[in-house]
Amino acid sequence: LSRSWLLVNAATPDVFAPALASEADSVIFDLEAAVPEEHKDAARQHVVDALSGGMTAWVRISATSTDHWQRDLEALTGLDGVRGVVLAETEEPEQVTFTAMRLRAGTPVIALLESALGIENATAVAKAPGTFRLAFGVNDFRKDVGVGEDPLAMAYARSRMVIASRVGGLPGAIDGPPGNTDGEDAVVDSSAVTASMGMTGRLVLNRDQVDWVNRAMSPSEDELAWARDLLEKHAQGAAVGDGSYLPRVLRAQKIADLADSYGLWNA
């Protein structure tokens, strides 16, 4: 389970190795928004060269409504270095399924929801064959809907994605990135909002922000101590005090599972 998903411009292959050497849990080579139209073909070839030459990464591919979608899929199919794809501008469940069908069997597809229609169809997309996780295209969503960046204004969309992920049996949703120039305090604060909404990962545009996102998205030392104490007592047969006991045990187990997936539980 990845906390940080670092997006890097596929048109500048010199950033691939530094990104993969960073603290990012996952790296995404971006063939879509970051790449100007005139550089699409060259960027696609850079990705093919990297993923057939020993590197492994996710790839953000173009929307199904574009000519580049088919070209991206043709280039990526069969490459051993493809960890999965992020499908831009997902709005319908069939878009994910059609994408998955054109890739090597078992290749995971992250559906990037970037519009009102995408959020409205979040549950159907989450349940679609081929969907691995949901991710939030925050900036494009704000442009489409006309809402501000205040957490309260974005709470409904984030909640819809979290609930849809749960209904679809998926891992927690991935939130959009902090501002590219945000400093540590701003990144930590906004990532705390992400975590409080029930999301378990976040896109990142700036490599310098990765460590801050990882820390903010991880269970705190206090949470880990509380979970260890409760789970130890539960394992020793602690008496059920009231109706809140079992929900607290489940919460503690969720913290333990998250921490274990991040390599923190036995650290």
Give residue spans per PLM region.
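Expand to "…catalyze enediolate/carbanion chemistry for C-C bond making/breaking, isomerization
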Residues: 1-267
